[in-house]
């Protein structure tokens, strides 16, 4: 049997959204979840994993950098979160993680 072992730092941001207080979870759900389709969740998580680097994230997503910029601009227009800013990217990432953790099949 092969078991995967994760360190605290590897899973902290994945489980953190479940430990946010209820009003903050509701804010994330009502304000940001409405704008999170599967494509946008993948975009946000990939951008986050590349520390906001648009070129390398676009390469991993197999899209043109301008397409990624268009997606981030569209997301900004819908949520006022600028994914080029690390603090806004973190908020969007936490919302994406909470969405994945609470989504029912």
Regions found by a protein language model. Give the residues of each.
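Cytosolic nucleotide-utilizing catalytic cores of signal-transduction proteins
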Residues: 1-105
